[in-house]
Amino acid sequence: MSKLSRHAAIRDAITSHPVQNQDELRRLLFKRGHRVTQATLSRDIHELGLVKTGEGYQFPSSEDDSNAAWLPSVERLIREFVYDVKIAQNTVVVKTSAGSAQPVAAALDAEGWPEVVGTVGGDDTIFVVTPSNKDAEKLQSRIKELIA
């Protein structure tokens, strides 16, 4: 199971049950098909920005109805999952680790970068359409800076 799917399972567990401690969260994840160590779970909790309150683990802005509190930044997703980027005229081809293309593509779409008209994400490849060849070069440079 990928880190992204594990993080999604943690988010689902936290939002659907009051979770008081890491062992309880580990058991909920196990029921969802994720076997995790305490060290991995602790890292995930930190990466997701969960806070422990009297009511259990929560996202910092749980009073906010938006899911933005748990979404990683596009920069972080690019740094973590993208390993190559090439240009084909006004299309940028982004290579990611297996299973990571769709979340990265969704983040690129949501970010509102002017160089991005739209994306198509497969399993490990994203096609990013840009308005022009010059915009494709700008986007390639932007992504290369993040993965360097």
From Swiss-Prot:
GO cellular component: a single term: cytoplasm
Disulfide bonds: none
Source lineage: Bacteria, Pseudomonadati, Acidobacteriota, Terriglobia, Terriglobales
Chief place of localization: cytoplasm
PANTHER family (UniProt xref): ARGININE REPRESSOR
Record-linked InterPro entries: Arg_repress, Arg_repress_C, Arg_repress_C_sf, Arg_repress_DNA-bd, WH-like_DNA-bd_sf, WH_DNA-bd_sf
Superkingdom of origin: Bacteria
Stated family: Belongs to the ArgR family.
Pfam families: Arg_repressor (PF01316), Arg_repressor_C (PF02863)
GO molecular function, one term: arginine binding
Name recorded for this polypeptide: Arginine repressor
Record gene name: argR
Function summary: Regulates arginine biosynthesis genes.
Keyword presence, Amino-acid biosynthesis: yes
Protein location: Cytoplasm
Protein's GO biological process: L-arginine biosynthetic process; protein complex oligomerization; regulation of arginine biosynthetic process
UniProt signal peptide: none
Pathway membership, UniProt: Amino-acid biosynthesis; L-arginine biosynthesis [regulation]
Keywords, in A-Z order: Amino-acid biosynthesis, Arginine biosynthesis, Cytoplasm, DNA-binding, Repressor, Transcription, Transcription regulation
Species the sequence originates in: Koribacter versatilis (strain Ellin345)
